[in-house]
Every structure is written in structure tokens, then in C-alpha cells.
């Protein structure tokens, strides 16, 4: 543990060796989602996660992501989970509904299962914003998943 102002700090790292990672990706706004997935899996492998220990499930849209995350989390087969998708504002209230319900579901499942979930579902005003953010967000999710899986192991 590191020390910060004489307080012991739990340390985590970004070593993904041996970690089992599940990814749930929406197929809606597929170009953006595939960009997120590419960046995410590339970063996971850079961090040492073996491709053989990465499992991907695709779902029709963002609202279907939480259910599959829940099943993966309950399976005991994963150290961390990642949600990938893109909800892009349209002309109706549907954007808020999908974004809020999906986000709340992901948070609840992480708390209920005790499995860390990196939320990589972009919520943007337009396609250009989503395309501009997909690479960085995909990589960020990979790092967050690995760091949180390792932190939870330290806390056990």
C-alpha cells in the first residue's frame, strides 16, 4: 500500500494478466460500437488480458445491455465487465429514457453482483461527437475494468 498524508492507500494496477473480461456491446449505431470495441479489446490486450479470456456478447440496443451484464455477472466466470454502446440524441424524449434506464441498470447490476462494470456507452448529441469519442472511451473502459478488477482483489 502507498501512503498518502500518513494514510495507507489500497493500490491497484493495470496488469490484466489472468483477468477474465466480459463485454456486452449494442449493435445499434454499429459503426460507433465497433470502434469502441476495437479500441477496448486492443487496450485490454496491451494491458495483458489474454484474448482467450475475453468474451463478447452483442445485443440489439442499449436497453438490452443490463440484462446480459447481469447474467454474466451472476455466472462467476468474469473478473470485470464492460458495456459498450452509443445512444445518440434524436428528435424525441427517447434519448433520455434510454440513457437514464440503461445507466441505472448498469450501476445496479455492478452493485448487486459485486463485479466491476466499466460503462462505455456513449451518450452524445450527434454522430460526430460519438465518432470523435469512440477510440478514447473504448480504451478508457479497458483500463477502468482492469484497474477495478485488481482493486477488488486487493480489498478481499
Swiss-Prot record:
Coiled coil: none annotated. Pathway: Cofactor biosynthesis; riboflavin biosynthesis; riboflavin from 2-hydroxy-3-oxobutyl phosphate and 5-amino-6-(D-ribitylamino)uracil: step 1/2. The keyword Isomerase does not apply. Keywords: Riboflavin biosynthesis, Transferase. Its EC number is 2.5.1.78. This is 6,7-dimethyl-8-ribityllumazine synthase. The keyword Cell membrane does not apply. (2S)-2-hydroxy-3-oxobutyl phosphate binds at residues 91-92, 133. It catalyses: (2S)-2-hydroxy-3-oxobutyl phosphate + 5-amino-6-(D-ribitylamino)uracil = 6,7-dimethyl-8-(1-D-ribityl)lumazine + phosphate + 2 H2O + H(+). Belongs to the DMRL synthase family. GO terms for cellular component: cytosol; riboflavin synthase complex. It comes from the Bacteria. 5-amino-6-(D-ribitylamino)uracil binds at residues 28, 62-64, 86-88, 119. One of its GO terms (molecular function) is 6,7-dimethyl-8-ribityllumazine synthase activity. The gene is ribH.
